[in-house]
UniProtKB/Swiss-Prot annotation:
It is found in: Cytoplasm; Nucleus, Nucleolus. Belongs to the universal ribosomal protein uL18 family. This is Large ribosomal subunit protein uL18A. Residues 251-296 are annotated as: Disordered. GO terms for cellular component: cytosolic large ribosomal subunit; nucleolus. PANTHER family: LARGE RIBOSOMAL SUBUNIT PROTEIN UL18, RIBOSOMAL PROTEIN L5-RELATED. The keyword Hydrolase does not apply. Keywords: Cytoplasm, Nucleus, Ribonucleoprotein, Ribosomal protein, RNA-binding, rRNA-binding. The keyword GTP-binding does not apply. Component of the large ribosomal subunit (LSU). Part of a LSU subcomplex, the 5S RNP which is composed of the 5S RNA, RPL5 and RPL11.
Length: 296
């Protein structure tokens, strides 16, 4: 078939159908969303849960959600900006922070449903493959599916750090080791030790040491916040170990106390009838006094 020119006549515009708003904005991949949202027909009203992971310039957002016609319902959420509470005040968007955020989400969700004592997850972090299995006589493991959005799912992406944190925290999420740091595509082998290094930010610590030796000015510029908070390369692993323990001990979100805002008024309040009459009387008296002065 040869080239056919699209004739944009009245019929073309009359029958033209625009794409979904979030597709037009380039925010949602509906091909992927359809498969993440539609539940098996034999499961009736059971929601299909998704673990949503989004990485912004200064934060990492992790949520557990399910779809309804009215919109997505968020069951639980955790953010990287909560990590300073657990002792991590720097590097809130690296792979190690993504792992901590995923772990916080999992522990918070299981605590909400009263399953935190049943499904402890993997307390000893090895970086190796781990899958949560349902325990007989207990409620089944909480199952959800990773929603990476429009993120390019390359090996070593931070999205998979959050996934690993959630799995180690006790959630059942189908996955393989092919996208974790430490997987070699040529030899088809996975090295859990490399993955463990990334979970404890040892790759960052190694770079800190290297930069300190080679160019101290560049080190001071790149790791200014680490220096400000007194974090050295040797302290990084212990920092994350303490954070993991702290998250497991108390994952509950604490609401900030509501601030009492004193309302400011930007326009004049309406005068009552008595005030209006008084105002008129004052103006009259003022006018009469001025007249008397003028006459005298």
């Amino acid at each position: 078939m040869g080239f056919v020119k699209v004739v944009k006549n009245k019929a073309y515009f009359k029958r033209y159908q625009v794409k979904f708003r979030r597709r037009r904005e380039g925010k949602t991949d509906y091909y992927a969303r359809k498969r993440l949202v539609i539940q098996d027909k034999n499961k009736y009203n059971t929601p299909k849960y998704r673990m949503i992971v989004r990485v912004t310039n200064r934060d990492i957002i992790c949520q557990i959600a399910y779809a309804r016609i009215e919109g997505d319902m968020i069951v639980c959420a955790a953010y990287a900006h909560e990590l300073p509470k657990y002792g991590i005040k720097v590097g809130l968007t690296n792979y190690a922070a993504a792992y901590c955020t995923g772990l916080l989400l999992a522990r918070r969700l299981l605590n909400k449903f009263g399953l935190d004592k049943v499904y402890e997850g993997q307390v000893e972090v090895t970086g190796d493959e781990y899958n949560v299995e349902s325990i007989d006589g207990e409620p089944g493991a909480f199952t959800c599916y990773l929603d990476a959005g429009l993120t390019r799912t390359t090996t070593g992406n931070k999205v998979f750090g959050a996934l690993k944190g959630a799995v180690d925290g006790g959630l059942s999420i189908p996955h393989s080791t092919k996208r974790f740091p430490g997987y070699d595509s040529e030899s088809k082998e996975f090295n859990p030790e490399v993955h463990r290094k990334h979970i404890f930010a040892q790759n960052v610590a190694e770079y800190m040491r290297l930069l300190m030796e080679e160019d101290e000015d560049a080190y001071k510029k790149q790791f200014s916040q680490y220096i400000k908070n007194g974090v050295t390369a040797d302290q990084v692993e212990d920092l994350y170990k303490k954070a993991h323990a702290g998250i497991r001990e108390n994952p509950v979100h604490e609401k900030k106390p509501k601030k009492e805002v004193k309302k400011k008024r930007w326009n004049r309040a309406k005068l009552s009838l008595e005030q209006k009459k008084d105002r008129v009387a004052q103006k009259k008296a003022s006018f009469l006094r001025a007249q008397e002065k003028a006459d005298s």
